[in-house]
Amino acid sequence: MITIEQLLDILKKDHNFREVLDADGYHYHYQGLSFERLSYDSRQVDGKTLFFAKGATFKADYLKEAITNGLQLYISEVDYELGIPVVLVTDIKKAMSLIAMAFYGNPQEKLKLLAFTGTKGKTTAAYFAYHMLKESYKPAMFSTMNTTLDGKTFFKSQLTTPESLDLFAMMAECVTNGMTHLIMEVSSQAYLVDRVYGLTFDVGVFLNISPDHIGPIEHPTFEDYFYHKRLLMENSRAVVINSGMDHFSFLADQVADQEHMFYGPLSDNQITTSQAFSFEAKGQLAGHYDIQLIGHFNQENAMAAGLACLRLGASLADIQKGIAKTRVPGRMEVLTMTNHAKVFVDYAHNGDSLEKLLSVVEEHQTGKLMLILGAPGNKGESRRADFGRVIHQHPNLTVILTADDPNFEDPEDISQEIASHIARPVEIISDREQAIQKAMSLCQGAKDAVIIAGKGADAYQIVKGQQVAYAGDLAIAKHYL
């Protein structure tokens, strides 16, 4: 429960309070109301709900519906003049985060918080950290793919970083379930829309940066994207940063006055020898590590997670065991066909991650290589040119372009746009299952491979704003082995 007096105090301390307006006019103080629930969904309110009117598409009709269900007061940046009191604020999203934090009893103070950001690798690093901490503690995890609030039951995540009301409700459930740590992926979008406003992490990890999520509904420029990624560093007590990433010197200067650990080529924490399924490290994580995920970048993700978990209480033995146990659904999953050709299923969904995926596969498969790829509709439009550029740099690759969450766009048009950046013929098969079947039928022996990129473990396609059932890349590939 939270009282009107408490929530006004929170807003005033954050300099986010304008006034309360009701039939009697303007009020700086207000009394007599308390709330047992928080909501931003007008269909889920009653007389004891504190409602947040948020979003560019919010309509007064939503409030009218809520009022018929008993709503007594709402918080908004706009007075909709509907006859009930309104708490007017300068920034509704910041208000949501701080009020949710207090409403749920400040659960962030009862958990050790670890956050990962980066253009790629967040989910893999989060899974590494989860398995490391699970050796001696009780970690919960909010990842792009799956969420667990009790370390036992996993469910599909809706957002990389949940909306603030959901985030703190889920954190509170983690505390109730006896969890000791929480591992999160924190997207640049989470900072852009203030989902984690006011939250301080015990350790923040910056894995890498490359152009992505740049478009009309995301970040207008790379500078804006990079800036919002860096906000995790400002909001973490200690940081772990990849010294091999672009713009590392800038980040090193930024974190010079806070506790920090670096890993990678310009640091003391390095991988000294690397095999397909093992590596040796020096520095704070010195030792031998077995790993199920192939690729040097996955070994670096393991190093990043290991350094973070070391600070959060994990032992070197915990870290070694955790790395050895980690598998990630939809990340570098490998199948073998009856003719011994390989099928790689991976979530690679931007130019940089695609380049790394192709490079890893080319190290191990020297025959005919076929790539199945698409790009999502109505977001991340810059990826399409990036995909074309990467494919152009791999001239021996046979490419079939297909659908990948086309949303409100025509998948054929998206494929044609990608193809326009490739200086050689490619095939377009918009039906993703048919594209996979065609590519697999072209494999002849153990040196050949099919690379299915983009969707990973997703068992749906986003079409016209809806999740449409899709068997999933891995299930389809297994069917045609």
Swiss-Prot record:
GO terms for cellular component: cytoplasm. UDP-N-acetyl-alpha-D-muramoyl-L-alanyl-D-glutamate binds at residues 42, 158, 160-161, 187, 195. The keyword Electron transport does not apply. The keyword Cell wall biogenesis/degradation applies. One of its GO terms (molecular function) is UDP-N-acetylmuramoyl-L-alanyl-D-glutamate-L-lysine ligase activity. Keywords: ATP-binding, Cell cycle, Cell division, Cell shape, Cell wall biogenesis/degradation, Cytoplasm, Ligase, Nucleotide-binding, Peptidoglycan synthesis. Its EC number is 6.3.2.7. ATP binds at residues 118-124. HAMAP family: MurE. Catalyzes the addition of L-lysine to the nucleotide precursor UDP-N-acetylmuramoyl-L-alanyl-D-glutamate (UMAG) in the biosynthesis of bacterial cell-wall peptidoglycan. Belongs to the MurCDEF family. MurE subfamily. This is UDP-N-acetylmuramoyl-L-alanyl-D-glutamate--L-lysine ligase. It comes from Streptococcus pyogenes serotype M5 (strain Manfredo). The gene is murE.
